[in-house]
Swiss-Prot record:
Its EC number is 1.2.1.41. GO terms for molecular function: glutamate-5-semialdehyde dehydrogenase activity; NADP binding. HAMAP family: ProA. The lineage of its organism: Bacteria, Bacillati, Bacillota, Bacilli, Lactobacillales. Keywords: Amino-acid biosynthesis, Cytoplasm, NADP, Oxidoreductase, Proline biosynthesis. It comes from Streptococcus thermophilus (strain ATCC BAA-491 / LMD-9). One of its GO terms (cellular component) is cytoplasm. It is found in: Cytoplasm. InterPro entries: Ald_DH/histidinol_DH, Ald_DH_C, Ald_DH_N, Aldehyde_DH_dom, G-glutamylP_reductase_CS, Glu-5-SA_DH, GPR_dom. The gene is proA. This is Gamma-glutamyl phosphate reductase. The keyword Cytoplasm applies. One of its GO terms (biological process) is L-proline biosynthetic process. It comes from the Bacteria.
Length: 416
């Protein structure tokens, strides 16, 4: 029996044990986990410091190190997120629909757990607890495989959660951590159809592509965000400037940060020089511009074709000038990762056309792409942002981690 077989078998058994936990029992456990995280902050920070030291030695950028960093305040924030999940309405057992058919059968469709969820993710150790809390709230067992760069932090966080489960008399195998960070073990998890009911990858383009190519278990694709801001010829340019600055600079290392700026030719001569000046007062951003934009920006560099398809996760932004709304939409649909896209315009009909025609999970009018988030959307915590169309799309909250079952009651009916 392989390492993944052992984890999978334990998760399968655990999923059956926790399937019948009441809402009250689940909420109580989650609140205990939140308390334990705060109480164990020193231990978690000590383990996190090992990852930060390794990241520094390995030349990982300061922006990416910030994604790894756990402070007392950040741990308190993770704990608060767990409490908020406890406060969310429990979807398990909810009736989706109920009716009596022509044969007199009473048919009720209810939400039920998935069973065993596996998650492969990179950096950001808070994901381990976010994922556990959502999985547990929906009566699912979860197997977590984090990145090598956050191995000590993830291990510490999962250890705290497992200890809280054990203290509550609930199987600790409701959450398991894959300590082997080899690609071979990750790929074995991708094909563990005997145990895993759903796999969620959360990370960069390379991880997502690997999972798409190799997974045999059902997958919800998440994460990669080559997000665009299109500044239309009817835009309020002051508003557009603030939206671009926020979407690019507030937190560039996250998937809902803007990576590409598309500008209508009619306003480009006024907008781009002013944007460049305004953004430079806040943060140094490298603009990689097409030929027309390059002539208008003092410090821009020429863009390569690859730049328009790149999720930079840094203070870098590609710039494209277009001659029409249709060209903007076609351009964005060519390079989008179907995450979040935005238009800035005062023309309602053009805004509606953009929202209808752009193929993305979240399409904004006159707002920053940075709002694509489960809490912001009122869904509570999220396990990721789905960029595909089947089962779930956009921020995935509790309902995305459920399946449904039909309950049929009869009185001796037979089919003729």
């Amino acid at each position: 029996m392989t390492y993944v077989d052992t984890l999978g078998q334990q998760a399968k058994v655990a999923s059956r044990q926790i399937a019948k936990l009441s809402t009250a029992a689940k909420n109580d456990l989650l609140n205990q986990v939140a308390k334990a995280l705060v109480a164990e902050s020193d231990y978690i920070i000590t383990e996190n410091a090992k990852d930060i030291a390794n990241a520094s030695e390995n030349g990982i950028s300061k922006i990416m190190q910030d994604r790894l960093l756990l402070t007392e305040d950040r741990i308190a924030g993770i704990a608060e997120g767990v409490r908020q999940v406890a406060d969310l309405q429990d979807p398990i057992g909810q009736v989706v629909r109920g009716y009596t058919n022509l044969d007199g059968l009473k048919i009720v469709q209810k939400r039920v757990p998935m069973g065993v969820i596996a998650m492969i993710f990179e950096s950001r150790p808070n994901v381990s607890i976010d994922a556990f809390s959502l999985a547990f709230k929906t009566n699912n067992a979860i197997i977590l495989r984090g990145g090598r760069d956050a191995i000590n932090s993830n291990k510490a966080l999962v250890t705290v959660a497992r200890k809280a489960l054990k203290n509550a008399g609930i199987t600790a195998d409701a959450v398991q951590f894959v300590e082997d960070t080899s690609h071979e073990v990750a790929e074995e998890l991708m094909v563990a159809t005997k145990y895993v009911d759903l796999l969620i990858p959360r990370g960069g383009a390379r991880l997502i592509q690997t999972v798409k190519e190799k997974a045999k278990v059902p997958v919800i694709e998440t994460g990669v965000g080559n997000c665009h801001i299109y500044v239309d010829k009817y835009a309020n340019l002051d508003m557009a400037t603030q939206i671009v600055i926020n979407a690019k600079t507030q937190r560039p290392s996250v998937c809902n940060a803007a990576e590409s700026l598309v500008v209508h030719a009619d306003i480009v001569e006024e907008f781009l020089p002013n944007l460049e000046k305004a953004i430079s007062k806040i943060q140094s951003v490298e603009f990689r511009a097409d030929e027309r934009a390059l002539k208008l920006m003092e410090k821009a560099v020429p863009a390569s074709p690859e730049d328009f398809a790149t999720e930079f996760l840094d203070y870098i932004m590609s710039v494209k000038v277009v001659d029409s709304l249709d060209e903007a939409i076609n351009w964005i649909n060519t390079y989008t990762t179907s995450h979040s896209e935005a238009i800035v315009t005062q023309d309602i009909s053009r805004a509606e056309q953009f929202q209808d025609d752009v193929d993305a999970a979240a399409v904004y009018v006159n707002a920053s792409t940075r709002f694509t988030d489960g809490f912001v959307f009122g869904l509570g915590a999220e396990i990721g942002i789905s960029t595909q169309k089947m089962h779930a799309r956009g921020p995935m909250g509790l309902e995305a981690l459920t399946s449904t079952k039909f309950y049929i009651n009869g009185q001796g009916q037979i089919r003729e």
